Amino acid sequence: MKKYLLDTNVLLRFLLDDHAELSQAAAGLFQQAADGKCILILTDLGVAEAVWVLTSYYKLERQTVAESLAKMIVKAGIQCPTQESVLDALTRFKASNCDFFDCYLAAQASASGVAVASFDKDLKKFEDVSLWDAGGVERG
């Protein structure tokens, strides 16, 4: 079966349906995946880029973005190699004011039991995440 690495621009055209020709082509590709004719591979970086574009350029609400992308990741014909971490990160993103990358780090740290080395005090919001002891240095 044919597999495609999904570029964020195709994902965005499908989600936004904002360009007659490109959105239609994207919808056709997603339909092929849903019909089992191909597999679309959505990477964690593709999700991160989509989150950034949808929230910064298109000014969509965090909750809307997180829910739309979470639904996308579990669709038939879509593979996300880091699905559990990405879904956890989207849940954290929706429920906090942390940026998506920090939410992804928190998801990875929680799943692996590895502490996060960061000066970002926002990560303290995630009770299931251990942070590096910065030796009394104030986190920013």
Where do the PLM segments sit?
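Active-site neighborhoods of divalent-metal-dependent phosphate/nucleic-acid chemistry enzymes
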Residues: 77-117
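Acidic, PIN/NYN-like endoribonuclease modules and their adjacent C-terminal/linker elements
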Residues: 3, 107-140
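Active-site phosphate/pyrophosphate-handling residues
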Residues: 9-10, 51, 103-104
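A generic structural signal for short hydrophobic patches within well-formed alpha-helices
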Residues: 11, 47, 123-124
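Residues that scaffold the ATP/ADP-binding catalytic core of kinase and kinase-like folds
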Residues: 13-15, 53, 126, 134
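Amphipathic alpha-helical segments within well-ordered protein domains
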Residues: 51-55, 70-73, 90
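Short, well-structured N-terminal submotif of metal-dependent ribonuclease cores
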Residues: 1-42, 57-67, 137-140
